[in-house]
Amino acid sequence: MIQSFTRLNVADNSGAKEIMCIKVLGGSHKRYASVGSVIVASVKKAIPNGKVKRGQVVKAVVVRTKKEIQRKNGSLVRFDDNAAVILDAKKDPVGTRIFGPVSREVRYANFMKIISLAPEVV
């Protein structure tokens, strides 16, 4: 469960290392974001010469959460960290590589480019 002021790791090579959630998109008063949700975030830590800079406001999709996700078959899936992938205006990833596993719920949210770049889909 991601909400405002939650800090997330960045799971791509866009240049950002850590982002902070500003707003959860979807609905008028949506409070929490889960895997597959799009958020608006501020870049808190970035590497020099990256595609995104520190302080920049970006959109990102959540790909991993520490809070477990219950699937329809009854299984629970949880990860070691909260992570997101930064998106551009067309909802494609800014980076060209994805690091770490990605949850299958990202596929259900129609982010196929992220699924194809991910090394592992859990």
Curated annotation (Swiss-Prot):
GO annotation terms (biological process): translation
Q: Which Gene3D superfamilies match?
A: Ribosomal protein L14
Q: Which GO terms describe its cellular component?
A: cytosolic large ribosomal subunit
Q: Which CDD domains match?
A: Ribosomal_uL14 (cd00337)
Q: Which InterPro entries match?
A: Ribosomal_uL14 (IPR000218), Ribosomal_uL14_bac-type (IPR005745), Ribosomal_uL14_CS (IPR019972), Ribosomal_uL14_sf (IPR036853)
- Pfam (any one): Ribosomal_L14
Q: Which UniProt keywords apply?
A: Ribonucleoprotein, Ribosomal protein, RNA-binding, rRNA-binding
Complex formation: Part of the 50S ribosomal subunit. Forms a cluster with proteins L3 and L19. In the 70S ribosome, L14 and L19 interact and together make contacts with the 16S rRNA in bridges B5 and B8.
Query: What HAMAP family does UniProt report for this protein, alphabetically?
Result: Ribosomal_uL14
Sequence similarity: Belongs to the universal ribosomal protein uL14 family.
Write down what this protein is called. Answer: Large ribosomal subunit protein uL14
Species this chain originates from: Helicobacter pylori (strain G27)
Query: Corresponding gene?
Result: rplN
